């Protein structure tokens, strides 16, 4: 679901001036399609700097809860700098509570904030509004206190679940991708190859759900992520295998597309 802010509290005040209109349009729309169009426009325009691209990507992530297309190419620009990306990510994850997170962000210089922003954009977690504003302001070279009190106190969120920070968005995204497969798996198969591959995928998913039911019914705690990672490894081996190349049309497009998304999800937690 999209986020929307009350009038007069636009995030563009925290961003670099040139991308202000783009940021304003993104935060006021409920359309992922609109955000994707804006991102592509900025990404493909060579005059925009890395700072500006990261800020647009941050807002894209905040509004859509997704990583903008080909953002990894932007994040690669920061490799080889003074910050190790994984170390920055671990430092962030080690903090407990908003105050510790805020202090950690404040301890980073501009380059460090860029690196952290990239890590959050590429992750499957949502970005909270306080973290968003602090990163945007820091990348712009502004002190967060210039803008943070106004934004965190007065932003009006219109979707009731927007602040659910404890929800596992990674599992949500996996479920979404698996649901995308449903029409293909339940449809009529045009070729023997299509029937075979769809049958394999369907069987793996059914086996996973049966295993999950058994684990849930055992009365013991179980790691749902661990079970799900096992499923993704099996599905990726099928959907990225040589047999899929034999398929054609919409079935091929959906299976390959979902396979790539599942691979990225698996890679993000491995």
Curated annotation (Swiss-Prot):
Q: Which UniProt keywords are present, listed alphabetically?
A: Viral envelope protein, Viral matrix protein, Virion
InterPro entries listed in its UniProt record: Mx/ML_C
Give me the segments passing through the membrane. none
**Locations listed in the record:** Virion
Q: Which domain of life is it from?
A: Viruses
Name of a matching Pfam family: Mx_ML
Gene Ontology cellular-component annotations: viral envelope
GO MF terms, alphabetically ordered: structural constituent of virion
Major localization class: virion
Write the protein's name: Matrix protein 1
Question: What is the scientific name of the source organism?
Answer: Dhori virus (strain Indian/1313/61) (Dho)
Q: What is the lineage of its organism?
A: Viruses, Riboviria, Orthornavirae, Negarnaviricota, Polyploviricotina
What is the gene called?
M1
């Amino acid at each position: 679901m999209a986020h929307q802010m009350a009038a007069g509290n636009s995030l563009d005040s925290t961003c670099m001036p040139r991308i202000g209109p783009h940021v304003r349009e993104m935060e006021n729309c409920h359309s992922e399609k609109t955000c994707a169009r804006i991102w592509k426009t900025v990404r493909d325009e060579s005059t925009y700097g890395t700072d500006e691209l990261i800020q647009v990507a941050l807002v894209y992530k905040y509004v859509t809860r997704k990583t903008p297309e080909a953002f990894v190419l932007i994040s690669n620009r920061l490799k080889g700098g003074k910050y190790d990306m994984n170390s920055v990510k671990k430092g962030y994850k080690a903090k407990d509570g908003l105050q510790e997170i805020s202090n950690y962000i404040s301890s980073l210089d501009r380059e460090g904030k860029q690196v952290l922003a990239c890590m959050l954009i590429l992750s499957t977690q949502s970005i909270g509004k306080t973290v968003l504003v602090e990163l945007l302001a820091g990348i712009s070279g502004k002190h967060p206190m210039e803008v943070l009190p106004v934004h965190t106190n007065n932003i009006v969120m219109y979707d009731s679940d927007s602040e659910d920070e404890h929800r596992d968005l990674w599992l949500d995204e996996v479920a979404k991708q698996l649901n995308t497969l449903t029409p293909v798996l339940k449809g009529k198969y045009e070729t023997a190859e299509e029937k075979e591959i769809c049958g394999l995928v369907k069987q793996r998913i059914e086996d996973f759900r049966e295993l999950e039911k058994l684990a849930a019914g055992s009365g013991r705690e179980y790691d749902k992520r661990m079970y799900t990672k096992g499923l993704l490894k099996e599905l990726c081996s099928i959907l990225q295998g040589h047999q899929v190349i034999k398929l054609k049309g919409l079935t091929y497009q959906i299976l390959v597309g979902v396979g790539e998304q599942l691979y990225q999800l698996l890679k993000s937690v491995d």
